[in-house]
C-alpha cells in the first residue's frame, strides 16, 4: 500500500477510534449505544474500503466481522436441528426463529456471533428429514474448524429408530463435530415435548441422546426434565406440535443464556 494511502487509512481509523471506541460498546448494555457504534463502525468500514479500492489495483474485501474482532471476540457457532429450528407455518420463520432471536440477545450483551444454522424438518440423528438428511449430514454442512460451539437440538423424530442404532448414529455425529472443530465445545439439547405426558418412545430418545452426549464430553440440556413447555399451550401452534412465534421467543430465552455460558468458558 503506498504511504499516502496508509496515512489516509491511519487518519480515518484514529478519527473513528476517537469518536466511538469499541470498548465503550462492549461495556454498555444500552441498545442505542450499540446501534450508534455499529452505524459509525459501518461508516468507517465503507470509507476504508473506498480508500483502498481507489488506490489498489486488486482491492481486498473488508468484512465487518474482521473489524469487530479486532477489539472483541467473534464467536462462530454451528447449530444443527429439526423443524423446531427451521421454523414452520406455525411460527419461527426468518427473524422470528429462536436462533435469530438468540443471536440478537447475545449481541445486545456484547457477545458477537457468526452463526451457521443447518436444520431440516423431520430430521433426527437416525431418521432422514424432508430433504434426505440426518443430523450427521447437517453437521458436515454447518460445522467449521474454527467454531467455538456446536449446538444440537432434538429430536422427537427419532422415536421410531432402534435405540442401538440411534446411539451409534448420535455418537458418530458428535465424533464428526469433534473432528471437524477440535477446540469447539459441544452443547446437546434433547427433544422437547409440548405437554407433561411424555411418550415412552420420546423418553427413550432423550436417554439415548443424553448418554451419547455425555460420552462425547458434551453438555446436555433436558427440556423434558426442565418442563419447558408444561402448562404453556399458548407457546404451541394449532398443530399441537410446533412452537409459534411466542414459543420461539421462549426457546430463545431458554437457550441464549446457555450458549452464552458455554462461550464464556472458552480458554
Region locations from a protein language model:
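Hydrophobic membrane-insertion alpha-helices, especially the h-region
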Residues: 39-57
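N-terminal Sec-pathway targeting helices
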Residues: 26-45
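Structural recognition of the beta-strand scaffold that forms the well-ordered cores
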Residues: 76-81, 85, 114-119, 148-154, ...
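Solvent-exposed loop/turn segments at secondary-structure junctions
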Residues: 83-86, 119-127, 156-161, 192-196, ...
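Active-site segments of SGNH/GDSL-like serine hydrolases
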Residues: 153-157, 176-207
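Serine-esterase "nucleophile elbow" of acetyl-processing enzymes
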Residues: 53-119, 140-142
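Catalytic His-Asp segment of secreted/periplasmic serine-dependent ester chemistry enzymes
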Residues: 194-267
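Oxyanion-hole/transition-state-stabilizing segment in secreted/luminal serine hydrolases
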Residues: 120, 131-167
Amino acid at each position: 500500500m503506498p504511504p499516502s494511502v496508509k496515512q489516509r487509512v491511519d487518519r480515518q481509523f484514529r478519527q473513528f477510534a476517537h469518536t466511538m471506541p469499541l470498548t465503550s460498546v462492549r461495556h454498555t448494555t444500552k441498545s442505542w449505544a450499540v446501534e450508534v457504534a455499529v452505524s459509525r463502525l459501518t461508516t468507517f468500514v465503507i470509507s476504508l474500503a473506498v480508500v483502498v479500492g481507489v488506490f489498489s489495483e486488486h482491492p481486498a474485501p473488508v468484512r465487518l466481522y474482521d473489524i469487530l474482532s479486532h477489539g472483541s471476540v467473534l464467536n462462530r457457532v454451528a447449530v444443527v436441528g429439526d423443524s423446531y429450528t427451521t421454523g414452520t407455518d406455525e411460527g419461527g420463520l426468518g427473524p422470528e426463529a429462536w436462533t435469530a432471536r438468540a443471536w440478537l440477545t447475545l449481541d445486545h450483551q456484547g457477545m458477537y456471533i457468526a452463526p451457521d444454522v443447518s436444520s431440516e424438518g423431520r430430521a433426527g440423528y437416525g431418521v432422514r428429514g424432508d430433504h434426505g438428511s440426518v443430523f450427521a449430514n447437517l453437521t458436515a454442512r454447518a460445522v467449521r474448524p474454527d467454531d467455538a460451539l456446536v449446538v444440537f437440538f432434538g429430536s422427537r423424530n427419532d422415536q421410531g429408530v432402534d435405540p442401538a442404532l440411534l446411539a451409534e448414529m448420535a455418537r458418530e455425529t458428535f465424533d464428526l463435530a469433534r473432528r471437524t472443530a477440535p477446540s469447539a465445545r459441544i452443547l446437546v439439547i434433547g427433544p422437547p415435548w409440548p405437554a407433561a405426558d411424555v411418550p415412552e418412545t420420546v423418553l427413550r430418545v432423550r436417554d439415548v441422546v443424553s448418554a451419547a452426549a455425555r460420552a462425547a464430553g458434551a453438555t446436555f440440556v433436558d427440556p423434558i426434565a426442565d418442563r419447558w413447555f408444561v402448562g404453556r399451550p399458548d407457546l404451541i401452534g394449532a398443530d399441537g406440535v410446533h412452537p409459534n412465534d411466542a414459543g420461539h421467543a421462549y426457546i430463545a430465552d431458554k437457550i441464549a443464556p446457555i450458549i452464552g455460558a458455554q462461550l464464556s468458558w472458552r480458554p
